[in-house]
Amino acid sequence: MAVANLTSEQAVLNEVARQDRNRRAIRIWLGCVLLALFALVLVGGATRLTESGLSITQWQPIHGVIPPLNAQEWQEEFDLYKRIPQFQLLNKDMTVDEFKGIFWWEWAHRFLARAMGVIFGVPLLFFVLTGRVERKLWLPLGGIFLLGGLQGAIGWWMVSSGLQARTDVSQYRLATHLVTACLIFASCMWFMRALSPHSNEPAPTRYSAKLAGLIAFMSLFQIYLGALVAGLDAGMSYNTWPLMDGAVVPGGLFVQSPGWINFFENPKMVQYVHRLGAYALFAVVAVNMIISLRAAAETTHARRSVVLFVLVLIQAILGITTLLLQVPLHLALTHQAGALIVFGFAIANWRGFYGEYPRQTVIAVRD
């Protein structure tokens, strides 16, 4: 009987070790996905800031992987661009060589987006077929893959808004595209953190997890507002801080009718709300840090609250500097990168309060 018990216990240990190896492999894979998503979002930001997003006027998911390879193909691509309002109203003097500059940004963004399907889908299929993914993860991970496919359609829906009557894309569709990318990013971060070892330390207060969730949602809302700012070029509305052209509440916030539309289409109002959102997020993160340090200063949870505060502080400094310098490309992209880092850490911090993802039990030890 002792030998049987020893054998059963060893089998359990072997199974736990196998699950540990599998979870580590999945964490590494999701980490690579997160890095690729991070790069994709930044290239997308550069595409918007350089006004390159309308340079490719067709959606060809397969054939579009291959860029123009000779002078004739470049001219054909340029001729397609000449048909849209952006060229006719803003870029009538553009040459083929200048067109190549904006084309490559949009092509790179689409190429990375297609590559994401391979980076996510192929390893997922391998992990499922070889039994490395626990069954209860099949549905959520498959859902992330499908959301990635939907994101491709949303991207074209966004681009198509600027091909007929506009010289740029709709800020509503731009915000939808960016928020969807962030939801994919958050989902990957959530499950990577869930499959990681967790501290057994109790939360500093009974409200800590809810506060962490609030911070994550506020971070996402700030990214949404930032997309509206980018879509409307609202960063150029006021380039002073802390006042907005000498006023705490500037004029011109409600010049459109109906009044609610100013929150989405008035560049001055959109920048104003983005500032207020930043102040609110900073305040909540600061309060969260103070509460955590007072309640349980030596815990991992408290240390995470300090890191989160520092990240938000850096992001605030980046945002102010970007504003004061009138939105230079390198600072605007750094600010966007900072937003994604803050959001990603906020998601990881939130998930850290719920412990490691329950393990799949397949072996029982008998007395």
UniProtKB/Swiss-Prot annotation:
Reaction(s) catalysed by this chain's protein: Fe(II)-heme o + 2 A + H2O = Fe(II)-heme a + 2 AH2
Q: Which domain of life is it from?
A: Bacteria
Q: Main localization of the protein?
A: membrane
Give a Pfam family name.
COX15-CtaA
Q: Indicate the segments annotated as coiled coil, or none if absent.
A: none
Q: What is its EC number?
A: 1.17.99.9
The record's section on HAMAP family has: HemeA_synth_type2 (MF_01665)
Q: What is this protein called?
A: Heme A synthase
The record lists the lineage as: Bacteria, Pseudomonadati, Pseudomonadota, Alphaproteobacteria, Hyphomicrobiales
